[in-house]
């Protein structure tokens, strides 16, 4: 598109430095791309650029690292990091919280990638029958029938839909209680929408509460909660659902799918674009304030959705600051080391300790 400016430096080299852009470019945040039905908003444009860039840098991600230049400063002791975290919360005018899989895992939703007690509690019969070593493994299995596939998918969806609000989320809520904030998440497990109204959360990877047409014949999504409950009840101790309960598109009759990235032909229609509009509008309204970008539990599968946009935006907004909490990595780009904090520790412990420090 003529005149479009990149948000980041996309020069091909082993380690990428975050690049500043002029503020006029930042605020001109709606781009129209040919052959698209919807305008591309600020945050989605940033994700698209970072995702496209990442294709040539997969070796760094596969090894558990990042291609960005990182700070080489020695981290402060844990207690000091907690004090700094609390201080940065208090000093910020507003907070954009980005929650990923590590946040839910820290509160007991740790059945996705591990064959542990939580996984066995909810998926034991499938582990015994198929040998899965985590919930995600079953999500990509080549099921022999639709009835078998939905026996598993219904169990998976039911597990997240009926999970209680996990403690790290309650602690985060207390930390944010006195702030102007917005939540961006790649989690599909509905934890955030159990806590906050729809307009305060952007679920850019989908939501387990909805079905879509597997053929994307329609832009519509529809309720999955009641059909999932019916399938689980009918299945009982078995592994398959009755044929008549296999969910189908009410428009074309094709098999339905959960409205989430990763299960198939993810519908990127009006509901999807609404998520990006919400976070982009929030950024547009707050960009000249002291924004704290708070990243929680981002892994190496999808860094271009929360982590790398937060890095780029912190670098681009002169009053912004950044905090990351992760139990496996401690990534802080050199470009934002003077305005950033990276804590490598259990997310549940960190949020509980920050809440205590703030007296909330």
Regions found by a protein language model. Give the residues of each.
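Cationic, low-complexity basic patches in intrinsically disordered or flexible, solvent-exposed regions
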Residues: 5, 14, 20
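Alpha-helical interaction segments
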Residues: 16-17, 33
